[in-house]
Structures are given as C-alpha cells and as structure tokens.
C-alpha cells in the first residue's frame, strides 16, 4: 500500500509552504510527487484556442515531492505528522492505514 493517496489530508514538512495543510488531488507514483490543493501554485501563460477559450495567465498547483509531505490524523487534537501502521478493518476485512499513536484510521477513509 502507498503511504500517501488521493484524498488524504497532509501537512507540508519542508520548503516554502512548511506547516501548511491541504488535500492530495493526484499522486504520481513513478515520479514520487503529489499535487496538493492550494500548495505550490505556479503561473502558466496560455494562448487562447478552441478548447481553452480564455488565454492569459492561469494559476495552478505544481507537484511537490512525497518526502516533503506527511499524513495528518484529523481525529487527534494535535497536528503532528502521523506514522502509519497497517491493519485490517474488522467490518470489511480490507487493509487500512492506522495512526500509530491514536490507532485511528488515517487518510480519506
């Protein structure tokens, strides 16, 4: 199982966006990068064309390396990064990600 998946709430632990939180929109496994909502915004200059009617400067998220992200346990009161252990959900008998400290489910589950 991957440590960080689409829909997970993460905290940035390094770089210019340190301590900010966001939701993972997309993960690129081979490149080890992820796009996080509202983080690492870049400006792209686009020409107007048939598909993209408006041209000009568009702001969008750029990928950030997975080593700069950490999962958050949103049920715990503190916002420290979470170390993950794997267990099975008794209801569905599937693998799930659990917080080591609080034993809560983590991620977008």
Curated annotation (Swiss-Prot):
Annotated spans, Disordered: 85-109
GO MF: rRNA binding; structural constituent of ribosome
One Gene Ontology term, aspect cellular component: ribonucleoprotein complex
GO annotation, biological process: translation
Keywords, comma-separated and alphabetical: Ribonucleoprotein, Ribosomal protein, RNA-binding, rRNA-binding
InterPro entries cross-referenced by the UniProt entry: KOW, Rib_uL2_dom2, Ribosomal_uL24, Ribosomal_uL24_CS, Ribosomal_uL24_KOW, Translation_prot_SH3-like_sf
SMART domains per the UniProt record, alphabetical: KOW
Superkingdom per UniProt: Bacteria
Keyword Ribonucleoprotein belongs to the record: yes
Role played: One of two assembly initiator proteins, it binds directly to the 5'-end of the 23S rRNA, where it nucleates assembly of the 50S subunit. One of the proteins that surrounds the polypeptide exit tunnel on the outside of the subunit.
Family, similarity comment: Belongs to the universal ribosomal protein uL24 family.
Subunit structure as annotated in this protein's UniProt entry: Part of the 50S ribosomal subunit.
Protein name in UniProt: Large ribosomal subunit protein uL24
Organism annotation: Mycoplasmoides gallisepticum (strain R(low / passage 15 / clone 2))
